[in-house]
């Protein structure tokens, strides 16, 4: 839950984590008519990943603003010809002159149209085995070459999106 991820960050900073309070907060949110906060994917998935594997620069730049709701994240995993089979990813990232240049497509991307950032799995080593050579990139959603197409359902809602990458260029340290 959002509160447990935030609680973990607090504990790592020297505070005391309280799982009971975290569960009570999550339960009260669930009972209320308040819509869930946007950015849960960033809080629940990105923040723990950065805590374990991120650089100090990434932790400083992204964790606090994500927990405060200042950065909304979407997840770029599923692809049209791969679904959730991440070993079949076809979106490619090539390191050129200190930048990742990304080409490909993601699908079923929740909240992409509202997000400032995407954490995205991209094949960066094309000659590696199917289950290797995949990197986790942090992509600003306002980068030139990104096109977002909402997938409108029969109730006219667009909770999911297709995201296309054409010559999307991000710094090498966004890995």
PLM-predicted stretches and their roles:
Residues 13-30, 127:
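Glycine-rich loop at the start of a catalytic domain that most often binds anionic cofactors/ligands
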Residues 37-57, 83:
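N-terminal glycine-rich flavin-associated loop
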Residues 84-85, 100:
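Hydrophobic, small-residue-rich alpha-helical packing segments that form membrane-like cores
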Residues 142-169:
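Flexible, small-/acidic-enriched active-site or ligand-binding loops
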Residues 91-94:
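A structural signal for short hydrophobic beta-strand segments in well-ordered beta-sheet cores
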Residues 99, 103-149:
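A short core secondary-structure module
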Residues 69-77:
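A short, Trp-centered hydrophobic/proline-enriched beta-strand micro-motif
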Residues 1-6, 10:
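Single conserved hydrophobic/aromatic residue that forms the stacking wall/gate
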């Amino acid at each position: 839950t959002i509160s447990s991820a935030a609680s973990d960050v607090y504990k790592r900073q020297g505070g005391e984590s309280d799982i009971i309070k975290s569960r009570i907060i999550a339960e009260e949110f669930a009972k209320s008519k308040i819509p869930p906060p946007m950015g849960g994917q960033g809080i629940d998935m990105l923040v723990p990943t950065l805590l374990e594997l991120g650089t100090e620069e990434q932790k400083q730049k992204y964790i606090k603003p994500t927990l405060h709701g200042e950065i909304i994240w979407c997840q770029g995993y599923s692809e049209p010809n791969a679904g959730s089979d991440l070993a079949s990813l076809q979106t490619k990232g090539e390191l050129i002159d200190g930048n990742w240049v990304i080409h490909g497509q993601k699908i079923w991307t929740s909240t992409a149209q509202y997000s400032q950032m995407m954490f995205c799995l991209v094949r960066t080593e094309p000659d590696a085995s199917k289950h290797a050579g995949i990197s986790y990139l942090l992509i600003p959603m306002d980068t030139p070459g990104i096109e977002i197409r909402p997938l409108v359902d029969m109730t006219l809602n667009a909770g999911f999106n297709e995201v296309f990458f054409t010559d999307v260029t991000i710094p090498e340290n966004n890995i």
